């Protein structure tokens, strides 16, 4: 698959921005806004800090009137759609019809997709708003609120007077600049004829309109602000600006005024277009493109205040003007009306949708007349999308087609996730061409194709990126519709302001049964006969493919490919790193000899040694899969071994290696988002480049006896908080033999126990300083073979709400367990089988003996997940308790959806919900008992506790239409997950 390349940005594209104040769909982003909640709340007269001018009194009266009509818009785009991603943000709008509750703001605020929001008036009254119109091209839209919701403020409206925008006019931009409650920015209009700014590729851009330019230094949050003159009339709409100067761009309000009048008259807002992008070019450039002197003279006489004419910049293939108008053509007239501005073009086209009009152009000095049928802009503006397989699709929009000069047709992937996640770095911009060798020219066809594909089916697809249409990408994808069960059509409803959902298929077709298949392994060739025993070890490797669509236990990855080792080919068991298989809410496929794939499931997750056991049906694999011979003695420093494994390109690698060390260690925790990691490990280290190149493998003797598994551990870089790091080390076979022996008799080790503490190595000097006697030092010197050290308690895990805290304390030095000297992590093995252990320790320079209980690990893995208000909630998994002293509740927020109520109202990831409406929520059962009775669109009070035990109180408004409540739960006494939906 090729890497898509972006087209080079123009100067405008790289320096212009829209003035939202908020965040996009990246996880954990929240709006970084400081708002003075007490502003103007005392009812006293407001004082505005205005620049010194000769008419301050007039401006004072004007601003006093204007601020009552200006609102702060707090909104969220709840899902990806077309060019826009999910986000939570704020902007500005203003009332243009107080009777009907109409608010004018920017189109990029209203957004092309699902919108939820409310407005806050100057006196801090709040009203829910719904979108009723967003223009297909120009940067304006309308929201509507119920005027009855505003009880304490006398509603006022601002008048739209586009003709009053003149060069030199003094203006004020009244809005929420930089997220502040109210900002008033002063400036003067300097231009009326600027071409629309470009904000970049694959995002919304206005075009085919003039923009007004001024220097007002507005920033985030001011989008949608009214630009008013001294009399308080709105002359333009704030839309964007330059990041490298104080320049602001205002939208002329001729089209917003017409749209408002249509809404007031309950008439449709017709919008016409011929799929041509025009640019205003100065006369000198028009001459170079072929404008005749006679035509220039006539235009200058008709329009003495204009500096140029409209020139075709882009003509879309298969559009109304394709083949009739060409790039570089100068527009002279439409329907015998001379043209010099976009304003007149809009007026003519909007009133003639479906009609054929005469266009007169000049091309190379020649006058050409073309009859062109006016198209409907609304018909090429998508108002539907489909969710299926964890991804989202809509018909290709005019916005994207114009950006890349392609026909307005095809299926556009606005959220390439789930089954359709092609590249983690690019979630949007893909055009889907075929699925399972069936063409998908439009959304309706895609729906029918997806209905025919069974669940868990691998199918070929072809697709392209809009930035690299020369390259056709072909990929085999796995259609998963049981974890991500939604297959629905969303249709925009401008009456309710919501998007109406229709389920397209109750259940997918059942998975096809797997048949036994043949495969052949190619043994590793060796010229050295002494290593012939290693040749067949390739038959013990199997490729593991994991799909984990739900980010349970804070696991950051959704798709993984690695290699595992078959530890029992007769019963079908595979050992794999928990870096790649962190939990059992996933789909797993094993690929043998790069030829056949069979499904597998997780049957065992070791709580601390970083490996998982997978089970497959060996009868499906007609190949010579081999169970290797396992050694029974641990590897030691200095021993030579032979490495066989796979690098990050999934290629087989072999090398002679030497054991550089065997260390007692813990994988560094991810402090920002705790997730599973290996602890209390005895790890094998290599002095070889293999140690950084290979994720999976084995260390073997010359005769093929496997001495260690080479696996990957997920942790955090110790010098860079928040940065993932992969630690690649060896796990000695002797640490796994007890589990392998049980697997040979088809017994899954379910009754494993665990000591809830982490240990670290300390030197003899440190131990001596902290109170270890010479007698004990002598004992350690007698029994230690490689390195003389003590183990000390690094941290003790927080107990669950139903447990007593572990009596061990951080800093305790361990001398013996059950009267056996503890010289390394392996000496802690009794914790896996014993209910309690007798520890002899040094605490505060005193030797003492304590009894430490172990815990049953049968319930340590997550078995219940709640999806509520856009938050993924579960009991705090073990990695969380490892880093805490006390757990505030068993209701832990592990992740949140971008654009959901949890994101909008500030529920932090890694926080605990302790109360809902002042009712204590100790666990998920009590949480569900409370929230199931809370109506939709209702404010509730939440009390949270941060990961650092800082209490927080917030309010949240439910939104079950877009974010319904559901659960994933394991059946009682079973490993099967079931979905529970709450309507």
UniProtKB/Swiss-Prot annotation:
EC class name: hydrolase
GO process terms (BP): apoptotic process; cellular response to heat; lipid metabolic process; stress-induced homeostatically regulated protein degradation pathway
S-S bridge residues: none
Region (Disordered): 1-40
Compartments where located: Nucleus
Region Serine protease, annotated ranges: 59-260
Main localization of the protein described in the UniProt heading: nucleus
GO CC annotations on file: nucleus
Cross-referenced InterPro entries: PDZ, PDZ-like_dom, PDZ_sf, Peptidase_S1_PA, Peptidase_S1C
EC number: 3.4.21.-
CDD domains: cpPDZ1_ScNma111-like, cpPDZ3_ScNma111-like, PDZ2-4_Nma111p-like
Source domain of life: Eukaryota
Protein family: Belongs to the peptidase S1C family.
Protein name: Pro-apoptotic serine protease NMA111
């Amino acid at each position: 698959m090729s890497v898509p390349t972006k087209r080079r940005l123009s100067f405008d594209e790289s320096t212009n921005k829209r003035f939202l104040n908020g965040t996009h769909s990246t996880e954990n982003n929240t709006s970084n806004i400081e708002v003075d909640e007490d502003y103007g709340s005392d009812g006293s007269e407001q004082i505005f800090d205005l620049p010194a001018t000769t008419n301050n009194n007039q401006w004072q009266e004007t601003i006093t009137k204007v601020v009552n009509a200006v609102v702060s818009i707090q909104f969220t785009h709840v899902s990806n759609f077309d060019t826009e991603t999910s986000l939570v943000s704020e902007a500005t709008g203003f009332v243009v019809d107080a009777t009907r509750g109409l608010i004018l703001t920017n189109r990029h605020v209203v957004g092309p997709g699902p919108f939820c929001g409310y407005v806050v008036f100057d006196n801090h009254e709040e009203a829910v708003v719904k979108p009723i119109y967003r223009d297909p091209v120009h940067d304006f839209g309308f929201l509507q609120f119920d005027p009855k919701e505003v009880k304490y403020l006398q509603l006022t409206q601002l008048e739209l007077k586009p003709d009053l925008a003149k060069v030199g006019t003094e203006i004020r931009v009244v809005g929420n600049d930089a997220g502040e409650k109210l900002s008033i920015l002063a400036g003067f209009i300097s231009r009326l004829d600027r071409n629309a700014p470009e904000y970049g590729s694959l995002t919304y851009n206005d075009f085919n309109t003039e923009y007004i330019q001024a220097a007002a230094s507005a920033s985030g949050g001011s989008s949608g602000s009214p630009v008013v003159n001294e009399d308080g009339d709105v002359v333009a709409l704030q839309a964007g600006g330059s990041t490298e100067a104080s320049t602001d761009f205002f939208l002329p309000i001729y089209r917003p005024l017409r749209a408002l009048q249509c809404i007031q008259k309950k008439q449709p807002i017709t919008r016409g277009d011929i799929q041509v992008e025009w640019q205003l070019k100065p006369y000198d450039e028009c001459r170079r493109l072929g404008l005749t002197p006679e035509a220039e003279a006539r235009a200058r006489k008709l329009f003495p205040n204009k500096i140029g004419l409209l020139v075709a910049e882009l003509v879309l293939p298969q559009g109304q003007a394709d083949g009739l108008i060409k790039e570089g053509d100068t527009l002279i007239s439409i329907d015998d009306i001379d043209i010099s501005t976009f304003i007149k073009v809009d007026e003519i086209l909007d009133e003639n949708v479906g009609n054929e009009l005469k266009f007169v152009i000049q091309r190379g000095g020649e006058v050409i007349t073309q009859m062109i049928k006016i198209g409907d802009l609304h018909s090429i503006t998508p108002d539907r999308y489909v969710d299926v397989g964890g991804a989202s699709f809509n018909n290709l929009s005019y916005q994207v087609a114009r950006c890349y000069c392609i026909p307005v047709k095809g299926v556009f992937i606005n959220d390439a996730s789930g089954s359709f996640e092609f590249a983690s770095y690019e979630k949007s911009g893909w055009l889907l061409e075929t699925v399972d060798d069936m063409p998908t020219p439009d959304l309706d066809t895609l729906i029918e194709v997806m209905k025919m594909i069974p669940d868990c089916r691998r199918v070929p697809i072809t697709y392209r990126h809009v930035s690299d249409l020369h390259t056709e990408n072909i990929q085999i994808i796995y259609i998963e519709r049981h974890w991500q069960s939604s297959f629905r059509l969303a249709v925009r409803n401008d009456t309710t302001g919501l998007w109406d959902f229709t389920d397209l298929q109750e259940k997918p077709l059942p998975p096809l049964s797997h048949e036994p298949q043949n495969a052949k392994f190619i043994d590793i060739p060796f010229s050295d006969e002494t290593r012939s025993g290693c040749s067949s070890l390739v038959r013990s490797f199997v490729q593991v493919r994991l799909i984990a669509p739900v980010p349970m236990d804070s696991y950051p990855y959704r798709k993984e490919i690695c290699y595992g080792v078959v530890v029992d080919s007769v019963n079908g068991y595979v050992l794999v790193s928990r870096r790649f298989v962190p939990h059992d809410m996933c789909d797993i496929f094993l690929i043998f000899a790069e030829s056949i794939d069979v499904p597998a499931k997780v049957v065992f997750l070791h709580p601390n040694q970083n490996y998982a056991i997978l089970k497959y049906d060996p009868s499906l694999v007609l190949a010579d899969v081999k169970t290797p011979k396992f050694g029974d003695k641990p590897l030691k420093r200095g021993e030579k071994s032979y490495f066989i494994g796979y690098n990050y390109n999934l290629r087989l690698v072999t090398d002679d290696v030497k054991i550089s060390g065997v260390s007692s260690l813990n994988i560094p925790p991810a402090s920002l988002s705790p997730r599973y990691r290996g602890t209390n490990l005895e790890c094998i280290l290599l002095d070889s480049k293999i140690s950084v190149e290979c994720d999976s493998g084995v260390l073997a003797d010359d005769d093929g006896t496997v001495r260690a598994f080479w696996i990957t551990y997920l942790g955090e870089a110790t010098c860079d908080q928040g940065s993932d790091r992969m630690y690649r080390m060896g796990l000695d076979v002797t640490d796994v033999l007890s589990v392998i022996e049980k697997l040979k008799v088809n017994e899954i080790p379910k009754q494993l126990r665990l000591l809830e503490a982490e240990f670290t190595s300390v030197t003899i000097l440190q131990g001596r300083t902290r109170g270890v006697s010479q007698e004990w030092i002598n004992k350690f010197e007698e029994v230690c073979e490689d390195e003389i050290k003590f183990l000390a308690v690094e941290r003790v895990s927080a107990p669950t709400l139903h447990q007593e805290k572990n009596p061990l304390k951080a800093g305790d030095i361990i001398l013996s367990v059950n009267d056996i000297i503890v010289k390394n992590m392996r000496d802690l093995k009794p914790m896996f089988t014993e209910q309690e252990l007798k520890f002899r320790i040094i605490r505060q320079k005193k030797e003492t003996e304590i009894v430490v209980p172990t815990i049953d690990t049968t319930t340590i893995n997550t078995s219940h997940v709640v999806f509520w208000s856009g938050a993924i909630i579960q009991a705090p998994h073990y990695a969380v308790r490892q880093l805490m002293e006390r757990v505030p509740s068993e209701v832990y927020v592990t992740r949140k959806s971008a654009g959901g109520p949890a994101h909008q109202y500030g529920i932090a990831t890694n926080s605990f919900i302790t109360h809902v409406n002042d009712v204590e929520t100790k666990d998920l059962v009590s949480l569900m008992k409370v929230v199931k009775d809370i109506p939709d669109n209702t404010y509730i009070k939440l009390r949270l506790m941060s990961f650092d035990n800082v209490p927080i109180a917030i309010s949240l408004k439910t939104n079950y239409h877009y974010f319904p409540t559901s659960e994933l739960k394991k059946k009682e006494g079973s490993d099967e997950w079931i979905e529970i939906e709450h309507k």
